[in-house]
A protein has these predicted regions:
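Glycine- and acidic-residue-rich phosphate-binding/metal-coordinating active-site segment common to enzymes
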Residues: 88-106
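Short acidic alpha-helical/loop segments enriched in Asp/Glu that coordinate divalent cations
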Residues: 73-94, 132-139
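Extended intrinsically disordered or low-complexity regions, especially N/C-terminal cytosolic tails and loops
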Residues: 1-75, 100-121, 134-192
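Secondary-shell segments that build the walls of catalytic and ion/ligand-binding clefts
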Residues: 123-127
Length: 192
């Protein structure tokens, strides 16, 4: 466990009486480790060419993004602000589940939009080897990815039929986004 995670574990009170005191800190550390793993794929991501290797890379990146989202979901479960955290786990996606933090004075809508874009992107990477087959909504001509280009505040968009090829920069951007979400969630924990 990192020094920061140990410090967080030492001062956090569990939100649910059945969870050990370190659950939030461990879930946070796991999410941060997953983010480091995604960032560590950066040298391997460029260039993401064509052919069978590109298919394997796309599926692997899609799977890693799915696991990173699961780690965020676990952190949400153990640090839930809702009175009945078990009900939160019935929500199908992290973008919906993170809404409980809206009551904490945090406008979660930008994070929700990005989490939904990342969900569509990882499905495209995992199931279609990165080829964009549908847009953000039915009849849309674009898919909004969950990453940004250098110097841009907007998420990158891809036309139908284009290939998603997350670059090293994109993977670092995704890693920073998830790590930042985890930090924000932990900072809202009781007694923190």
């Amino acid at each position: 466990m990192t020094g920061r995670a140990s410090a967080v574990a030492a001062r956090l009170t569990p939100r649910h009486p059945d969870l050990p005191e370190t659950s939030v800190a461990l879930a946070h550390a796991t999410l941060r480790q997953g983010a480091r793993h995604i960032a560590g794929l950066a040298p391997w991501a460029d260039p993401m060419g064509e052919g069978p290797q590109a298919v394997v890379r796309a599926r692997y990146v899609g799977n890693c993004l799915r696991e990173l989202d699961r780690f965020l979901g676990v952190l949400l479960d153990v640090s839930c602000l809702a009175p009945r955290p078990r009900l939160l786990t019935l929500k199908p996606d992290t973008a919906t589940r993170i809404a409980v933090y809206e009551t904490d004075g945090w406008d979660v809508r930008p994070a929700q939009r990005r989490l939904r874009a990342l969900e569509r992107s990882r499905l495209c990477l995992f199931h279609d080897a990165g080829r964009v087959g549908c847009g953000d909504v039915p009849q849309a001509r674009w898919l909004t990815s969950g990453w940004r280009d250098a110097g841009s505040r907007d998420l990158r968009r891809y036309a139908i039929g284009a290939r998603l090829r997350p670059s090293a920069l994109h993977l670092h951007d995704i890693a920073g986004f998830y790590a930042g979400l985890g930090d924000r969630i932990v900072s809202g924990a009781p007694d923190s």
